[in-house]
Amino acid sequence: RWIATIMVLWGIASTATMFATGPTSLYVLRILVGITEAGFLPGILLYLTFWFPAYFRARANALFMVAMPVTTALGSIVSGYILSLDGVMALKGWQWLFLLEGFPSVLLGIMVWFWLDDSPDKAKWLTKEDKKCLQEMMDNDRLTLVQPEGAISHHAMQQRSMWREIFTPVVMMYTLAYFCLTNTLSAISIWTPQILQSFNQGSSNITIGLLAAVPQICTILGMIYWSRHSDRRQERRHHTALPYLFAAAGWLLASATDHNMIQMLGIIMASIGSFSAMAIFWTTPDQSISLRARAIGIAVINATGNIGSALSPFMIGWLKDLTGSFNSGLWFVAALLVIGAGIIWAIPMQSSRPRATP
């Protein structure tokens, strides 16, 4: 129900942005959008831990997060056509954009309120046998976790306050690693069309929108493959860190040549690596945080790490103004990804005993 509430409020705030009349009202409304959406991703990630055991969670995360490249691809194509509605019913194109892309969240939130069950034991569509089987899987999942060297023991975890459990070096390392990742995610969502425009001078907005959809389509396939590979191998550390480096290589490739096809290949690599890393990244923090602190812990990592999504647009824009090209901004994002990969490899992680998965 909390997820449904967030979606409705988020949709209302996003739609209300169409009524902005100046910089002040726009800033206030955008801050309101940020406040209403803040709990959505942590809430979904926590919700998935109630339904899927750790050995299946990379795929579960990926299937949920596939929505990001899907909406980015569709948004790149659809937004150009929505903006062409400028003047219809006395509304400007940008107002139609907020209305048609914000209001569906309200409708979907209402549907979620009635259709999405809070936990397996409340799911009417599951039989008693299904509920029992799923609960046994979740119980066994908790028992098979192996403590790595340097991790907090269960007894010690029970003796410390929830806040002391959250603000540990391990959680802070996760936060820094996520900060490095959100920089590239922001660069993909905000700057890809403009980067492609700089590579393809003279192309129309619709053409650029279609080109911007290509990396996202490739990303969908890459995310699903890499998450399945991680679940089959029951390995998280390398499956998280390597996509960081793959994305960094993509940004460097895009900045190193003037050949359009190679630049597009670099952006595709950056998109696949970034989103694949994100899907598997979120399978790991919950293994270092107890159930009682999991919701707040995930929220802390998400909220603090998301500062990177605000830094990246500023830095890339500033460096472009300073140098006259996107290259230095792409180097900045690539450097953060390399640092993030190093942090991931340095984090002590729990693991599950290997088991076959479908």
Please provide the spans of the model-predicted regions.
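A late C-terminal transmembrane helix in Major Facilitator Superfamily
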Residues: 288-325
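Helix-breaking motifs and short loop linkers at transmembrane-helix boundaries and internal kinks
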Residues: 19-25, 36, 53, 234, ...
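Cytoplasmic helix-loop-helix junction between adjacent transmembrane helices
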Residues: 29-66
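Symmetry-related core transmembrane helices of the 12-TM Major Facilitator Superfamily/SLC fold
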Residues: 95-114, 330-346
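C-terminal transmembrane helical hairpin of 12-TM major facilitator-type secondary transporters
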Residues: 234-284
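Extracytoplasmic gate region of multi-pass secondary transporters
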Residues: 164-227, 278, 282, 312
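Glycine-rich segments within core transmembrane alpha-helices of 12-TM secondary carriers
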Residues: 59-83, 104-105, 302-312
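Primarily marks hydrophobic transmembrane alpha-helices of the MFS/SLC 12-helix fold
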Residues: 3, 26, 239-240
